Curated annotation (Swiss-Prot):
Belongs to the UPF0377 family. It comes from Saccharomyces cerevisiae (strain ATCC 204508 / S288c). It comes from the Eukaryota. The lineage of its organism: Eukaryota, Fungi, Dikarya, Ascomycota, Saccharomycotina. This is Putative UPF0377 protein YIR040C.
Length: 110
């Protein structure tokens, strides 16, 4: 699966389909509910990964945050990286053991 990441626009293009994403260092969040997002500015409370960004990015779909790196203490989600059809009404910071973690399924990261 070939994907191109344009850092300036913060968009991922795959087979002529555009995914709006939120990029924070080496992780990218895609809406779990519709596969899209309304990207503006990432507002993360903590860096999800401490490793530097490397290319190419690897892609994993339909996985839970709990299935990702177990060493990561927390993941973040900006209020603008959620599906625009269902805006969130809570804090946008989920610990790994949060019951709301299932909201974020599609994740692109390196």
């Amino acid at each position: 699966m070939e994907m191109t990441l344009f850092l300036n626009e913060s968009y991922i293009f795959h087979r002529l389909r555009m995914w709006s994403i939120v990029l924070w260092h080496s992780c990218v969040f895609v809406c779990a509910e519709c596969g899209n997002a309304n990207y503006r500015v990432p507002r993360c409370l903590i860096k999800p990964f401490s490793v530097p960004v490397t290319f190419p990015f690897s892609v994993k779909k339909n996985i839970r945050i709990l299935d990702l790196d177990p060493r990561t203490e927390a993941y973040c989600l900006s209020p603008y990286s959620v599906c625009s059809k269902r805006l969130p009404c809570k804090k946008y910071f989920y610990l790994l053991n949060s019951y709301n973690i299932k909201r974020v399924l599609g994740v692109v990261y390196c």
